[in-house]
């Protein structure tokens, strides 16, 4: 194998797990950060943060590979996805399966490391949550074939990015309202931004015969996104208030909440180019990161 061929192969692997587009990885890690900085034990230990980041990257990689395995016959028919490595043949089926197993092995190694510092009850809970997360993560890509709102399935997947870090930090899910609210905020935010992501593919999805919340909601999709973002910001703000964060949280929270509504309002413009939906997704990473920054600063003495 020549150096150029090897480099192209590695680049194809990175595309398969979407590491060439960091916004998609960050948008999973941000709710994990919300969770860690809202636990009673906040701020979290640096080692715990590092393990959660590594585990999140591994699970995200596994989810992306599973998505492309499910969609390898559909992706060539969709403008946005036709150049993905499995769709255009740069990565073979067996190669993708091997990478999927590797990603799951890394996620398992992270889980076992996290469990070492927990009491017996906490270890059992962490293992149960990890096992419960696996089916929706691997089956989510199939939801568009049988469910009109597959973005709800992704939201459930994202919810585990809140539950697992909380359990790893505290050894339980006895978080009361703060935990319930940050979990709900994550589900709502995820449904909103993934609905926008699906809006870019409406014409292709309609012609292929697959489903999405963008198609199911029709002209009401921008309103649904705005409501989802508004409720998500409210839930996260209430969770922060219940945990007693510092005053610095609130100006940043207001800025992020306003930004989310502004972005949702822009979706009402007629004849938006496909690129506008990608920019919206990137801005949600920024706004979600701003909310995380607010929580981090709120923990400072």
In which residue ranges do the predicted regions lie?
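Hydrophobic alpha-helical transmembrane segments in multi-pass integral membrane proteins
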Residues: 163-172, 289-301
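Intramembrane alpha-helical segments
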Residues: 14-15, 62, 84-181, 263-268
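Membrane-embedded alpha-helical segments that form the functional core of polytopic membrane enzymes
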Residues: 29-70, 80, 104-112, 123-138, ...
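Hydrophobic residues within membrane-embedded alpha-helical segments of Major Facilitator Superfamily
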Residues: 27, 57-59, 99, 103-106, ...
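Multi-pass membrane catalytic core of lipid/isoprenoid biosynthesis enzymes
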Residues: 29, 50-54, 72-130, 207-247, ...
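Membrane-water interface of transmembrane alpha-helices
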Residues: 63-73, 191-202, 259-268
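Transmembrane helix-loop junctions in multipass membrane proteins, especially transporters and channels
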Residues: 40-44, 72, 112-120, 145-149, ...
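Interhelical loop and helix-boundary elements at the membrane-water interface
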Residues: 2-26, 73-100, 137-157, 202-227, ...
């Amino acid at each position: 194998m020549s150096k150029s061929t090897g480099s192209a192969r590695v680049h194809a692997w990175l595309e398969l797990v979407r590491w060439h587009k960091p916004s998609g990885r960050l948008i999973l890690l941000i709710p994990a950060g919300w969770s860690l900085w809202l636990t009673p034990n906040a701020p979290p230990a640096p080692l715990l943060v590092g393990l959660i980041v590594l585990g999140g990257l591994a699970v995200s990689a596994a989810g992306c590979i599973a998505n492309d395995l499910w969609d390898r016959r559909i992706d060539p028919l969709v403008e946005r996805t036709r150049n993905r490595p499995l769709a255009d043949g740069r990565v073979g089926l067996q190669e993708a399966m091997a990478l999927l197993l590797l990603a799951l092995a890394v996620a398992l190694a992270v889980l076992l490391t996290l469990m070492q510092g927990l009491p017996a009850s906490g270890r059992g809970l962490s293992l149960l949550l990890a096992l419960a997360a696996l089916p929706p993560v691997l089956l989510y890509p199939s939801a568009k074939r049988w469910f009109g709102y597959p973005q709800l399935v992704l939201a459930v997947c994202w919810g585990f990015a809140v539950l697992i870090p909380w359990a790893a930090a505290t050894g339980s899910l006895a978080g009361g309202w703060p935990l319930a609210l940050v979990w709900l905020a994550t589900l709502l935010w995820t449904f909103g931004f993934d609905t926008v992501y699906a809006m870019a593919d409406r014409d292709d999805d309609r012609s292929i015969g697959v489903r999405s919340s963008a198609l199911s909601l029709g002209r009401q999709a921008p309103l649904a996104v705005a409501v989802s973002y508004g409720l998500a910001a409210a839930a996260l703000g209430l969770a922060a208030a219940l945990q007693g964060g510092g005053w610095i949280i609130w100006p940043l929270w207001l800025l992020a909440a306003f930004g989310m509504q502004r972005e949702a309002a822009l979706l009402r413009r007629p004849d938006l180019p496909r690129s506008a939906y990608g920019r919206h997704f990137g801005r949600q990473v920024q706004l979600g990161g701003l909310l995380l920054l607010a929580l981090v600063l709120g923990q400072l003495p």
